[in-house]
């Protein structure tokens, strides 16, 4: 396993910074939440994130990002969470789509499919690694009636997840914990199941986060993950391929994108038995997973989806960038907000390119089990 320096746990400092930057904006959504940020603290987060992205793709550049994985990811989500919710909703992941199926329905089905493949039930205590603002957890809780603990390294997202759980009267089943998934503070063998939806990609080394998941799972417990990986078609030495991977990294707060084979080997190395693996982005679906970003209107299924697809399309993203730029100019939005939307635009363009060329998948599904006789 590649050697990575684990982050210092400065939880109180993180909490104070989140409070200074976000205040009570966790009770708001979208642009209104953005307008409620403390501008000086937002400037600190912007500088803290973009200092890592100057176009450098050398081994030294990558090592700096890998070593600063925790701060990089925290700053990223301090900056983009409100934009994500505005454009995409509270489940920060991609999905497969079928004709006649609305965007929100597809999102829920993608979450249900994972829970189904893992056989999650009401008697299980489940860990959601990298839980975001809790959208998938709320859906899986309703679907299975299980108890879920969400783990997140971003205080603002933890606050939002707690707020939503209480709002939707699920706080008896859902709880959220601040923590670094590379060094979890849970007791060993304390969960019946663990899942991660497009979250462990933020780990500097996949073997590191998978080993922590293995540790907290009970013997016989199941781990399910939708992993972001570069496919077998990706060539690290191909300049165009590397440009696409870098665009995904800078726009999505990822220290380094790894290939599929790295994820598979990492699971095996820590002791998991892989029971199921499938790239759900490579099954010849009529509607591609990236269509909302590509703005392919022919695939829009419902009237309500028109608003979502407009916001996520090239035209909608351009409108958002210009509006946010104007708000920043007149002091309604924090300094650097337009730079953030620019990074999200880079991400969208390269995610689509990676999807079209089948170089990248956001839904490499693994179902893996910790052996019953694990020590």
Curated annotation (Swiss-Prot):
It catalyses: zymosterol + S-adenosyl-L-methionine = fecosterol + S-adenosyl-L-homocysteine + H(+). It comes from the Eukaryota. Keywords: Lipid biosynthesis, Lipid metabolism, Methyltransferase, S-adenosyl-L-methionine, Steroid biosynthesis, Steroid metabolism, Sterol biosynthesis, Sterol metabolism, Transferase. GO terms for cellular component: endoplasmic reticulum. One of its GO terms (biological process) is methylation. Its EC number is 2.1.1.41. Pathway: Steroid metabolism; ergosterol biosynthesis; ergosterol from zymosterol: step 1/5. GO terms for molecular function: sterol 24-C-methyltransferase activity. Belongs to the class I-like SAM-binding methyltransferase superfamily. Erg6/SMT family. This is Sterol 24-C-methyltransferase. It comes from Clavispora lusitaniae (strain ATCC 42720) (Yeast).
């Amino acid at each position: 396993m590649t050697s990575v320096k684990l982050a210092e746990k400065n939880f109180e400092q993180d909490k104070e910074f989140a409070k200074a930057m976000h205040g009570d904006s966790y009770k708001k959504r979208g642009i209104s939440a953005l307008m409620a940020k403390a501008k000086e603290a937002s400037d600190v987060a912007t500088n803290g994130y973009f200092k890592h992205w100057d176009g450098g793709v050398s081994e030294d550049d990558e090592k700096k990002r890998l070593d600063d994985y925790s701060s990089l990811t925290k700053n990223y989500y301090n900056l983009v969470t409100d934009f994500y919710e505005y454009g995409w909703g509270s489940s920060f992941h991609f999905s497969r789509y079928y004709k006649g199926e609305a965007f929100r329905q597809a999102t829920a089905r993608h979450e249900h499919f994972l829970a189904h493949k893992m056989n999650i039930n009401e008697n299980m205590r489940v860990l959601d690694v990298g839980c975001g603002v809790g959208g998938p957890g709320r859906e899986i809780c309703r679907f299975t009636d299980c108890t879920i603990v969400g783990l997140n390294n971003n205080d603002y997202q933890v606050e939002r997840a707690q707020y939503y759980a209480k709002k939707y009267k699920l706080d008896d089943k859902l709880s959220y914990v601040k923590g670094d998934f590379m060094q979890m503070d849970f007791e060993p063998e304390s969960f019946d199941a663990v899942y991660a939806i497009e979250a462990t990609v933020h780990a500097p080394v996949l073997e590191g986060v998978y080993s922590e998941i293995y540790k907290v799972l009970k013997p016989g417990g199941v781990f399910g993950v939708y992993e972001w990986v570069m496919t077998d078609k990706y060539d690290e030495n191909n300049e165009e391929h590397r440009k696409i991977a870098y665009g995904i990294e800078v726009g999505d707060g990822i220290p380094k994108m790894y290939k599929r084979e790295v994820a598979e080997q990492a699971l095996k190395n820590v002791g998991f038995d892989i029971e199921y693996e499938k790239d759900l982005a490579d099954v010849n679906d009529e509607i591609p997973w990236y269509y909302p970003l590509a703005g392919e209107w022919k695939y829009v299924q419902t009237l309500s989806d028109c608003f979502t697809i407009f916001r996520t399309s090239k035209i909608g993203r351009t409108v958002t960038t210009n509006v946010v730029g104007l708000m920043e100019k007149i002091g309604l939005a924090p300094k650097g907000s337009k730079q953030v939307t620019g990074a999200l635009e880079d991400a969208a363009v390269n995610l689509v390119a990676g999807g079209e060329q089948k170089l990248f998948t956001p839904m490499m599904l693994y179902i893996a089990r910790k052996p019953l006789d694990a020590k």
